[in-house]
Amino acid sequence: MNTPTRTAVAIGAFASLAITPLVQAADWSDTALSVRYGTQFAEPYDNHADGSRVDIAKTIVALTNVTGYKYGSTFINVDFLQSDGKDPGGGVAGHPGAQEVYGVFRTTVDLGKVTGASLKMGPIRGVGVTAGFDLNTKNDGYASKKRMAVVGPTLMLEVPGFLNLSALLFDESNAPQAIARRYHYKNHAAFEADWGIGIGELPLSFNGYAQWITAKGEDEFGAQTAPESHIDMDLMLDAGSLAGLSKKTWLVGVEYEYWHNKFGNKTATGPFLAGDGATASTPMVRVEYHF
């Protein structure tokens, strides 16, 4: 069993164990299984001889849970990513496409609910503290094993749905196969917006997140990292309700991701630079089943 498969099993088991008690203690909960597909993904350092990026097709299967409880909310997402042969396993041309598992856990504690005091101020409906972690593994030539802790304040805005603005501190490390021990980057900041908003009375929703992440000092090979921009958003149609099924069960739609200086790798051409592969503009199709 290869590393991504072992990690997928471990993360899947963790997600199941984490989701079950959260759902049991929840005021409300939503779990979804989704599939998305696009043909214009990119990876740092994966470039053609002329310096242009290699377009990679990926199929991504995700398990997601969002839960609200007495004092706040939690978010769990596990992505299982399968690349085509343009992003080969082991970084070896001709091998089957690489596999990646990326897990995210966040919890936001609403300080107003904890203290019993109203913290509403104009368009701000609440103030919270967000904490959590990211982790991943991938079996390409780099063989990422990212681990990252996250903490910071969050403003929750008054909108139909939700819109949260956070200022976060990231404590990140990685242990790719080319180095002997885990490398810790300089602690760095991120400014993030997360939203899920219905569109009037239409069976449509607009969801996503946007991040701007500061540089994190030198990477494990001594190169300077760069600030990172990452936007991922989707427009989803409640197809199930239109077909006479339960509302918000089967959703179909389109998704768009823009990622500049992916994972802090600078989009620039030259020796030891990531080239155009460090930036991608990726349209996708997406299907979700909620249960």
PLM segments and residue spans:
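Outer-membrane beta-barrel transmembrane domain signature
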Residues: 172-249, 291
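Outer-membrane beta-barrel "beta-signal"
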Residues: 277-291
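Residues on the lipid-exposed face of transmembrane beta-strands in outer-membrane beta-barrel proteins
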Residues: 63-67, 105-113, 151-157, 191-197, ...
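Short glycine/proline- and aromatic-enriched beta-strand/turn motifs that initiate or cap beta-hairpins
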Residues: 25-77
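Surface-exposed loop and membrane-interface regions of Gram-negative outer-membrane beta-barrel proteins
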Residues: 77-142, 224-228, 269, 274
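Short loop/turn motifs that connect adjacent beta-strands in outer-membrane beta-barrel proteins
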Residues: 23-30, 66-75, 111-128, 156-165, ...
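Transmembrane beta-strands of outer-membrane beta-barrel pores
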Residues: 37-41, 80-84, 131-139, 169-175, ...
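Cleavable N-terminal export/targeting peptides
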Residues: 1-28
